[in-house]
């Protein structure tokens, strides 16, 4: 069986933490920021993590991460 290919679009968007979780950036932070509160924008700067239900799917997309 040939090697599995990593989906490059996903590889650029996710990093693996030391414990093996997938770290991601949060959405809704690129434009239309004037109507969002200071608190909301501050929370969007923090990292998000892939949910456990999605991790199995992501492991197929990113086999070598």
From Swiss-Prot:
Choose one Gene Ontology CC annotation of this protein and give it: cytosolic large ribosomal subunit
- GO-annotated biological processes: translation
Q: Please state what the protein is called.
A: Large ribosomal subunit protein bL35
Supply the NCBIfam families for this chain.
Answer: rpmI_bact
UniProt record similarity statement:
Belongs to the bacterial ribosomal protein bL35 family.
Question: What Pfam families does this protein map onto?
Answer: Ribosomal_L35p
Which superkingdom does the taxonomy of this entry point to? Bacteria
Instruction: State the taxonomy lineage.
Output: Bacteria, Bacillati, Bacillota, Clostridia, Eubacteriales
Q: Which InterPro entries match?
A: Ribosomal_bL35, Ribosomal_bL35-like, Ribosomal_bL35_CS, Ribosomal_bL35_sf
Any idea which UniProt keywords this protein has?
Ribonucleoprotein, Ribosomal protein
Q: Which GO terms describe its molecular function?
A: structural constituent of ribosome
């Amino acid at each position: 069986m040939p090697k599995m290919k990593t989906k490059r679009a996903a590889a650029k968007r996710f990093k693996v933490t030391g414990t093996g979780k997938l770290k991601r950036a949060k959405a809704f932070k690129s434009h239309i920021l004037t109507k969002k509160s200071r608190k909301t924008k501050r929370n969007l700067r923090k990292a998000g993590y892939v949910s456990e239900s999605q991790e199995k799917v992501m492991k197929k997309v990113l086999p070598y991460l």
